[in-house]
Design a protein with these regions (language model features):
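Feature for soluble, non-membrane regions of globular proteins
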Residues: 1-201
Length: 201
């Protein structure tokens, strides 16, 4: 099946004031759509065209060399953004609960310590990329990736990811990436992140 743009699970303005409606419109309708269009071109005519996105990214080094970079950037971009929309909510913020909260406390000390590590990784990411909370098969970890690289490419499971490409925040925050990262936690859906954790723990 070709890659397809998933609908936003909320209105463009639902995440204001943290993320403004125009940023959401451009980010979803233009940027994400471009990753899909270019990802489909990269996979077209290969044995990977009908494979699940997760399988493509987990085996990115097996793709034809002349398609690999485009697939890495664009299929990765699609996977990253599809998750990004799902883990945000107009009713977001607060703190996690249950097994996820326990795992965060065991690994990082507290939710505030986790936020600090995720934010620091995002601030330190030079240029464009993502900052992540992942499950690496044994437990939780914070990592960052360049461009549209996905933790799926290294066998890890993304639980939470924050886009630190400028297109994700520049209209509202200009060059103030730390402010964007600090504000983003107001829209995180811990319910969605917790469901992702339950699926892999």
């Amino acid at each position: 099946m070709p890659l397809e743009l998933p609908p936003l699970p909320y209105d463009y303005a639902a995440l204001e004031p943290t993320i403004d409606a125009e940023t959401m419109r451009l980010h979803h309708d233009k940027h994400h759509q471009a990753y899909i269009d270019n990802g489909n071109k990269a996979l077209e005519g290969t044995e990977w065209a009908d494979r699940p996105v997760e399988a493509v990214l987990a085996n990115i080094d097996l793709l034809p060399e002349d398609r690999r970079a485009a697939a890495r950037n664009n299929v990765g971009g699609h996977a990253n953004h599809a998750m990004f929309w799902e883990i945000m909510s107009a009713d977001g913020g607060g703190e996690p609960s249950g097994a996820l909260a326990d795992a965060i406390a065991d690994t990082f000390g507290s939710i505030d310590d986790l936020k600090t590590q995720v934010n620091e990784a995002g601030v330190k990411r030079f240029g464009s990329g993502w900052t992540w909370l992942i499950h690496d098969g044994t437990g939780l970890a914070v990592v960052s990736t360049p461009n549209q690289d996905s933790p799926l490419m290294t066998g890890d499971t993304p639980l939470l990811g924050i886009d630190v490409w400028e297109h994700a925040y520049y209209l509202n925050y200009q060059n103030r990436r730390p402010d964007y990262l600090a504000a983003w936690w107001n829209v995180v859906s811990w319910e969605a992140v917790g469901a992702r954790f339950e699926a892999v723990r």
